[in-house]
Amino acid sequence: MIAANPTDLEVYLFHEGRLYQSYELFGAHVIRGGGAVGTRFCVWAPHAREVRLVGSFNDWNGTNSPLTKVNDEGVWTIVVPENLEGHLYKYEIITPDGRVLLKADPYAFYSELRPHTASIVYDLKGYEWNDSPWQRKKRRKRIYDQPMVIYELHFGSWKKKPDGRFYTYREMADELIPYVLERGFTHIELLPLVEHPLDRSWGYQGTGYYSVTSRYGTPHDFMYFVDRCHQAGLGVIIDWVPGHFCKDAHGLYMFDGAPTYEYANEKDRENYVWGTANFDLGKPEVRSFLISNALFWLEYYHVDGFRVDAVANMLYWPNNDRLYENPYAVEFLRQLNEAVFAYDPNVWMIAEDSTDWPRVTAPTYDGGLGFNYKWNMGWMNDMLKYMETPPHERKYAHNQVSFSLLYAYSENFILPFSHDEVVHGKKSLLNKMPGSYEEKFAQLRLLYGYMMAHPGKKLLFMGSEFAQFDEWKFAEELDWVLFDFELHRKMDEYVKQLIACYKRYKPFYELDHDPRGFEWIDVHNAEQSIFSFIRRGKKEGDVLVIVCNFTNQAYDDYKVSVPLLAPYREVLNSDAAEFGGSGHVNGKRLPAFSEPFHGKPYHVRMTIPPFGISILRPVQKRGERKQNEEEVHRHVIGRRARKPASLADEKHRETSRAVWGEVPDH
């Protein structure tokens, strides 16, 4: 139960930057006790001369509803002796120079539908969750050696009703979940759902950090959506923006007439690129606000993780000719990750960082930032640049494919083809591909196949699964009419089977963060733009051979070295006719020959598809398996397992072991 008045300990921890449930102190809370009921409001406004409560319950006249100042640091509170659930409200703040500001509650749990901006008293309690099996399953598995394919989407533009209205959170549970499950995705990632005034910002310029946007329903409706996802076996990750916020007059900006949540120095405060304000990450009260917010989404909405947006904008001071590290941001991110993993060691904390900042996913006690995953922006940019290169010129850009393996194990990576790559004139993924209509599809199938075979978890933005031709338009739904066209249907089928193949074979994901899981067979064939490599699982002898051809030239009887003396079966070929390809496949088992080639004792002769990927798997009899496992063991002996980055500092080492487990040396 919420106390009628803030406790001294709560207030102290808030001002120390260590009140991680500050949402229990601030905001609007219905309180009950002794047969009475009331509603407590609490707000932080350190520069205010006076604060009044206004709303639909007092005709927006705060004369008789002044808040009491709790301390000199600006905590104000009032208890209204009524149950005000469902009522609109704002804070009327009198600044030191006498100006009157009407502000929404920074800790509001629900807000009016835009363009209106009032906060709404809402009791979050009362929803009955049914996701206990999902939570138990999460605790049993280490996330690092599990398959992960994320479906990234914008809630308002995935699909719309015939009259153009949004689907609600509850309606989307029926529409979205079966679609995502049918294609085999393991998680969905939602562009920001905090309350935000402008649709065009996609949610990245928010101001109501504790208020799930009312565009699609109520907080309980969103709980229902997440609950349904978990019951279906889908994880839910949300985009979260702790670096900057919108400057609309009703929001956080100059909250009490002076810089409150933002930096005092204008050069540090103003984010001129996005037209927003940067959070003052050195201010303890702001840290309490933001870290509590992450824990709030975990506690009340059961989300499984966060993709932390624009980490580079936090790590470096903005608006400087040279890049200077922001020590407040570094300390904040470490404190954030420690707090999150102390709460739940199975959370996904994903950094969207475009810089080469070292050790983003390394332990905080060892100087790292403490995330457990990072988007691999370097791989994404190199691969898209390579694929946009005319095929006959790709031999001159060969290292754009191979370079990523030089740093693939420096962090725990996710390979993203995200919303950022299909907007602002960048073209859709399909339209980035050069060549004819059919060649565009072939190369996109190849690109997706290579992404699945490359070390790292995977992310694909909505519409890419059926090769949307146009860029993403936030105000329109996806081009579902494309399912009327054969190659788009076949692309969708290919993505289904590709993800199923990825999830079926453990070498694709078990050693994503261990160098033993990948080995080049031939990385030097620039002339033909052909790459071949091995992916390995934890079990000795569990291997896949992958061959990628980035030109339109097919090859027969092509020699590829293999690690085991066994026949090989092609488990997937992107050029299969069922996917819209030309049919250059390996329909029969491929025998391995005992002739050394490319540093291996064996090789096969196979068909290489044009603009295609072929995935081979050895077919072994039980008697052969032990012998082959011994050969593989001899080959990899001495290659050392890399322990994925742990996350806690010295005082959280026990939590760290719970997160990562023990990885033995080899």
UniProtKB/Swiss-Prot annotation:
Its EC number is 2.4.1.18. One of its GO terms (molecular function) is hydrolase activity, hydrolyzing O-glycosyl compounds. Optimum temperature is about 39 degrees Celsius. Disulfide bonds: none annotated. The active site is at residues 309, 352. One of its GO terms (cellular component) is cytosol. It catalyses: Transfers a segment of a (1->4)-alpha-D-glucan chain to a primary hydroxy group in a similar glucan chain. Residues 622-634 have a biased composition (Basic and acidic residues). Pathway: Glycan biosynthesis; glycogen biosynthesis. Pfam families: Alpha-amylase, Alpha-amylase_C, CBM_48. It comes from the Bacteria. Residues 622-666 are annotated as: Disordered. One of its GO terms (biological process) is glycogen biosynthetic process. Signal peptide: none annotated. Keywords: Carbohydrate metabolism, Glycogen biosynthesis, Glycogen metabolism, Glycosyltransferase, Transferase. PANTHER family: 1,4-ALPHA-GLUCAN-BRANCHING ENZYME. Catalyzes the formation of the alpha-1,6-glucosidic linkages in glycogen by scission of a 1,4-alpha-linked oligosaccharide from growing alpha-1,4-glucan chains and the subsequent attachment of the oligosaccharide to the alpha-1,6 position. Monomer. NCBIfam families: branching_enzym (TIGR01515), PRK05402.1 (NF003811), PRK12313.1 (NF008967). Belongs to the glycosyl hydrolase 13 family. GlgB subfamily. This is 1,4-alpha-glucan branching enzyme GlgB. It comes from Bacillus caldolyticus. The lineage of its organism: Bacteria, Bacillati, Bacillota, Bacilli, Bacillales.
